[in-house]
Amino acid sequence: GKIKIMYDSACHLSTLADALEIGRICDEYGFYWYEDPYKDGGVSIHGNKTLSQNLSTPILIGEHIRNPETSVDLIVNGASFFSRADPDYDGGITGSHKLVVASEGLGIDCEIHSCGPAMRQLMGASRNSNFYEVNLLHPNCSNPWSLPIYLNNYSDEINCIDNSGNVKVPNFP
C-alpha cells in the first residue's frame, strides 16, 4: 500500500514566510497535510488562510485550540481543511465529540490528537476520522504517552499496530 506522509510543525516555525517555504516542500512531495505550521498558536485566520490559498497541501489547524467555536471559525473561513480534537484538553470525550459532529456537518474530517483509551473510543465513534496518532514512537524507545496505569494489557507502544496498520478499539475497561 501507499503511505500517507504528514508534517506537524507544532507551531514551531517563526514566521508565515517560513511556513510557506516549508509548505512548498510539502507540496513538492505530496504530503497529506501540513499541521499547525507556525507560531500563531493556530488562531490566525488570515495567516492560515493565506497558507491554504498558496499551497496545495491541506492545512490542519487545531492542536493548540481548546474549543469547537475557534476550530469552526478557522474551517468556515478557509484557514483549515481539517479539525483536530483531543479528549485530554478539549472537554473530554463529550467536548471533543462536539467538534467531531460540527466537522462532520461541515463535510470535513476531524483528526483525533495523541493516543490513549479515550482517543481510541472517540475515533471509533467517529465517521470522519482517518488516522490514530501513536505519537512520539520509535522502535528503539518506548512511547512516553503509553502509561502503565491501564488494565488488560492496554498499550500504545509500537506493538499496538497490527500487520494491516490498524489499532484496535478496546471493548474492556
Predicted regions located by residue number:
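Shared catalytic-loop signature of beta/alpha-barrel
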Residues: 24, 30, 41-61, 65-166
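Short, well-ordered beta-to-alpha junction loops that form the rim of enzyme active sites
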Residues: 10, 114-115, 172
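Metal-dependent enolase-superfamily TIM-barrel catalytic cores that perform enediolate-based chemistry
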Residues: 1-50
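Short, intrinsically disordered, charge-balanced linker/junction segments flanking boundaries
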Residues: 165-173
